[in-house]
Amino acid sequence: MDMAADIASDHFISRRVDIGRITLNVREKGSGPLMLFFHGITSNSAVFEPLMIRLSDRFTTIAVDQRGHGLSDKPETGYEANDYADDIAGLIRTLARGHAILVGHSLGARNSVTAAAKYPDLVRSVVAIDFTPYIETEALDALEARVNAGSQLFEDIKAVEAYLAGRYPNIPADAIRIRAESGYQPVDGGLRPLASSAAMAQTARGLRSDLVPAYRDVTKPVLIVRGESSKLVSAAALAKTSRLRPDLPVVVVPGADHYVNEVSPEITLKAITNFIDA
């Protein structure tokens, strides 16, 4: 089943939420306990719509454009882990729907674990997809280069799709289309990313900060998900993380690269539900 192909007829409520420190754009669907989704660097909330459709019969699913991304505010500074974590805490408090399950990919995983460690009273549990401590410098160098290369002018949506398909060769076409249609804005001469290039540069640098304290200190349940062929989280980084926290469950998704939730949405969905229902 192609989950990304099924979203056209499903209704999502999109709105901006003022949490006091910043205004964040969110997409919402469903009812029940609160489940928040946080995307990776340069991405936006739309990438989680296929998963939200499948989970919205049990949960109030809300995907967030994180600061500097999508249609959320883009301050000039403030792109460290604690800045993003404070946004998560502010959003949970503003929504006032009780403690939340956090599902994060990459940057979103880093931010979710940081928030859970810093604000345990606001978080029920975390699904951390393909971002751990101990990521090698070379992997972060490559990520930063990809991020900075994405700030360019595109002639039209087809040019965006072609660029994204080359950048993310394992992401299915329907998921590429979601990224293309949700992540770019018209400007003179074509289309540019909605994500702020200055914010992306600061965020990429911030991903190098030490994540060991957050993983060491977090007391809420955390599921670690890694793509088997991820070029960001190596098998060695995952092994060191498991030695740091042998109590945290791990799912390695066969055949998936870093973009686990888009490449393997069905396995991601099963991992989330098995973890929550355990």
UniProtKB/Swiss-Prot annotation:
Effect on the protein of changing residue 230 to A: Loss of catalytic activity
Gene Ontology molecular-function annotations: 2-(acetamidomethylene)succinate hydrolase activity; protein homodimerization activity
Record-annotated active site: 106 (nucleophile), 130, 258
Keyword Amino-acid biosynthesis found: no
UniProt xrefs under Pfam families: Abhydrolase_1 (PF00561)
E.C. numbers: 3.5.1.29
Binding site for chloride: 41, 106-107
Tagged with keyword Lipid metabolism: no
GO biological process: vitamin B6 catabolic process
InterPro entries (UniProt xref): AB_hydrolase_1, AB_hydrolase_fold, Carboxylesterase_BioH
pH dependence: Optimum pH is 7.0.
Reaction(s) catalysed (UniProt annotation): 2-(acetamidomethylene)succinate + 2 H2O + H(+) = succinate semialdehyde + acetate + NH4(+) + CO2
Name of the top EC class for this enzyme: hydrolase
Keywords for this protein: Chloride, Hydrolase
Pathway given in the UniProt record: Cofactor degradation; B6 vitamer degradation
PANTHER family per UniProt: HYDROLASE ALPHA/BETA FOLD FAMILY, PEROXISOMAL MEMBRANE PROTEIN LPX1
Functional note: Catalyzes the final reaction in the degradation of vitamin B6 from (E)-2-(acetamidomethylene)succinate (E-2AMS) to produce succinic semialdehyde, acetate, ammonia and carbon dioxide.
Family designation: Belongs to the AB hydrolase superfamily.
Known partners and oligomeric status: Homodimer.
Protein name: 2-(acetamidomethylene)succinate hydrolase
Source organism of the structure: Mesorhizobium japonicum (strain LMG 29417 / CECT 9101 / MAFF 303099)
